[in-house]
């Protein structure tokens, strides 16, 4: 069936709007990216031909621009759009895998969190939950707003850690100003969490402050040593 022969409710874009992206087939999703057909062939037809050009989606993702434009109806602009979409999906997949990175030093946390936190205009207090091998098993934002030691409750944070069977946690929060100097509230909050962690047997390994492509580790700054 050609696109123009479809009733509006059956068109890929309309189905996505009414039923969500998950309701669409691979053919329909590709047709949205392809956007327009060619004389006598709809974007659905071209999408089907595109899928036939590779054994599976993973192989299609590996197709070069030259490979893509061999499919009739796929010109340079469409090939570029498809390649960009494939790469974006690949990067999102890598991000999901990176949620289980192993933390060996403060810079590992910074490398992981700076891209998502450096441009935030409001303070976000995040905890990374780690297993016994210091691999991140979950990332949770527990607070948004100006950090205050009376607002960040250890009970809430450690209840999450217990529920997720975490062996240790790392606190991370951003300073929208870009200045990564720990405030007095930052230090007080850190010490409270560290003390509670010692009691519960779930160590606070570090508190990382993120700024404008910079970070401060309260462990490296010596705040943990002073209270050991």
From Swiss-Prot:
It comes from Staphylococcus aureus (strain Newman). Pfam families: RadC, UPF0758_N. The keyword Mitochondrion does not apply. CDD domains: MPN_DUF2466. The lineage of its organism: Bacteria, Bacillati, Bacillota, Bacilli, Bacillales. Residues 102-224 form the MPN domain. SUPFAM superfamilies: JAB1/MPN domain (SSF102712), RuvA domain 2-like (SSF47781). Belongs to the UPF0758 family. PROSITE patterns: MPN, UPF0758. GO terms for biological process: proteolysis. It comes from the Bacteria. GO terms for molecular function: metal ion binding; metallopeptidase activity. This is UPF0758 protein NWMN_1555. InterPro entries: MPN, RadC_JAB, RuvA_2-like, UPF0758, UPF0758_CS, UPF0758_N. Keywords: Hydrolase, Metal-binding, Metalloprotease, Protease, Zinc. Zn(2+) binds at residues 173, 175, 186. A motif (JAMM motif) lies at residues 173-186.
């Amino acid at each position: 069936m050609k696109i123009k022969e479809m009733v509006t409710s059956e068109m890929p874009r309309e189905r996505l709007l009414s039923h969500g992206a998950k309701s669409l087939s691979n053919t329909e999703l590709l047709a949205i990216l392809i956007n327009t057909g060619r004389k006598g062939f709809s974007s659905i037809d071209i999408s089907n031909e595109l899928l036939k050009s590779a054994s599976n989606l993973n192989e299609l993702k590996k197709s070069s621009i030259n490979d893509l434009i061999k499919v009739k109806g796929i010109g340079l602009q469409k090939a570029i759009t498809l390649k960009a979409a494939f790469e974006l999906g690949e990067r999102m997949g890598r991000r999901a895998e990176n949620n289980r990175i192993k933390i060996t030093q403060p810079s590992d946390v910074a490398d992981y969190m700076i891209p998502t936190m450096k441009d935030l205009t409001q303070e976000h207090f995040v905890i990374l939950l780690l297993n016994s091998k210091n691999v991140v098993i979950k990332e949770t934002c527990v607070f948004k707003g100006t950090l205050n030691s009376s607002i960040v409750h250890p009970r809430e944070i450690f209840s999450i850690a217990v529920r997720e069977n975490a062996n240790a946690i790392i606190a991370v929060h951003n300073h929208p100003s870009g200045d990564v100097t720990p405030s007095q509230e930052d230090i007080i909050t850190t010490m409270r969490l560290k003390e509670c962690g010692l009691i519960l047997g779930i160590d606070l390994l570090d508190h990382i402050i993120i700024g404008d492509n910079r970070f401060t580790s309260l462990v490296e700054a010596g705040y943990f040593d002073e209270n050991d």
